[in-house]
């Protein structure tokens, strides 16, 4: 499960985060095709107009939209970035945890991979699809929660490898200044040996 109900668990009141659809990541092509077939057997249909390559939109008779993701985002213009994201997306299948959400155990990414999916989702919307405040709110409540240091380090290693630390740092600085993000929780991402951050802006 990506975003949605999983991300809502970080909000002080889960219902504050409106979920427009259900996002499920299945990067393996055979499993992806099987998932589509299973959903169709249960009356879920593929929507007539598809707006993206990285997911297939389906809906049931009640109008609930399910997005089956074969990737975290559309392809970017940099092939090296795409290859790294694809690598980490495939690794997500073995970096899962069970979250109890409203009494149900749901498979969600481990913290580092959840953070990565949120970061890539923001980057996708920033570059391709329009950027909304909801993305920043998700990012703030996620990082205002307590997380394991080793998972934080894993996340930072991944975004460094992909080459998007600059984007993530810019988002963090905006969120600290305007949206109440806890600076101490993300300072490891906004200052390193290559970057001097003027803390007066906070």
Name what the model sees in each region.
Residues 1-20, 26-202:
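Conserved NTP-donor binding/palm subdomain of two-metal-ion nucleotidyltransferases/polymerases, i.e.
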